[in-house]
Amino acid sequence: MTFDRSIKIAPSILSADFADFGREIQAIEAQGADWVHVDVMDGHFVPNLTFGPPAVAAFRKHVKTVMDVHLMISPVDAYIDAYAQAGADVLTAHVEAGPHIHRTLQAIRAAGMKSGVAINPGTPAEAIEHVLDIADVVCVMTVNPGFGGQKYIDMTAKVRKLRAMIGDRPVHIEIDGGMDPVTAPLMAAAGADVFVAGSGVFKGGSVSTPEVYGKNIAAIRAAAQAAL
């Protein structure tokens, strides 16, 4: 996984057909997905329950691009090795999930993965400034975490601030929540380069009509690129 700031679309399989994950992953990748985003929720840090390491390992068999695993769990550190063994390429933990995010990011890198730090809408950008040297991805939540399909919360000022803080470090700014052809360009103009989209990609399509996924991915990408 090499670093560049080109626009990347990361469909969230939380919005896919749960009965057909393998073919759904194959479909979105064939239709232009750059990363595959996997939302892990524990029913404790967030009020929903999704995928553990065995599910992520099953997804890995189908993912040919980058498997981007977003941990919405607390605690995090005890599970890092399990997600590394499951095949995560990027493992993202929330700054709000514990008191030692620096140690968590170090452990993620030590396990052979790219490290990500996520930040909720109510948390200021300054909360992660001290770990930007050991982060590969900063994930800015533009919804409160826990469920797909929520209404977008504008985080333009926060993204601009983070872009300035990051400077020339090789760190992606990823946006998670409510991304579509209207909201993605706002974030791209502020400095983001990776866009997580669940319903924005999967709405209206299926493994039988994957071209809909392709149109949705292309529309988000084109809108974001036009804002640069």
Swiss-Prot record:
PROSITE patterns: RIBUL_P_3_EPIMER_1 (PS01085), RIBUL_P_3_EPIMER_2 (PS01086). A divalent metal cation binds at residues 37, 39, 70, 176. It holds the Pfam family Ribul_P_3_epim. Substrate binds at residues 12, 70, 146-149, 176-178, 198-199. Pathway: Carbohydrate degradation. GO terms for biological process: pentose catabolic process; pentose-phosphate shunt; reductive pentose-phosphate cycle. The keyword Flavoprotein does not apply. Catalyzes the reversible epimerization of D-ribulose 5-phosphate to D-xylulose 5-phosphate. This is Ribulose-phosphate 3-epimerase.
